[in-house]
Amino acid sequence: MLQPVFWLIVGMILLIIFMTDLLYGVIPLSVNLLFFSLVLLYRVILVAFGQMTVADLWLSALSAFGLSMFFIFLQKITKFIKKVDGLGDGDIALSPALGLLLGWPKIAVGIFMAFVIGSIVGIALIGFSKKKFNQTIPFGPFLVIGAVIALVWGGSIWSWYIGMLQ
């Protein structure tokens, strides 16, 4: 009974994040905190009822931390090189919830998909003169799209990719 309610709320939060970042260029910290708290509570409940191992919870927590550090690094390096923020604070604040929600290796699939889709859309917008090269494009919608792809097909995509490496 808990899972459908959880996924419905997650879907609504992801839709709010998608639309607010797309329309206003911001992801409210309150929404990110609510999202993270909800995912953390859900994961702890899964562990308490034996539907998730403590090791998997730790791996998800490490995914959350690792993604956050990666995004902070990207923001700092683009600030140093280009003198602009490459990622907004809302994107960075969203990363722990996504890492905890997806865990490893789905988070890798989700972030890869977000960057690929975001790059394609960005190039298309510049190509069709809808945006200039120095204008920002909200990244939150692409993080949401990447997360949804990872939730639905992340395991299959990861298995396919690993199979290609062997």
Question: What does each of the following model-derived ranges do?
Answer:
Residues M1:
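Cys/His-rich short segments
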Residues V116-K130:
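Transmembrane alpha-helical segments of integral membrane proteins
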Residues D89-G90, G127-I149:
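Interfacial loop-to-transmembrane junctions
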Residues V44, I72, I123-G127, G155:
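Membrane-embedded alpha-helical segments of multi-pass transporters/permeases
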Residues G110, I126-N134, S156-L165:
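Extracellular/periplasmic helix-loop-helix junctions in multi-pass membrane proteins
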Residues L40-R43, V148-V152:
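Aromatic-anchored segments of alpha-helical transmembrane domains
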Residues P4-F6, M12-I17, L23-I117, W160, ...:
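Functional transmembrane core segments of multi-pass inner-membrane proteins
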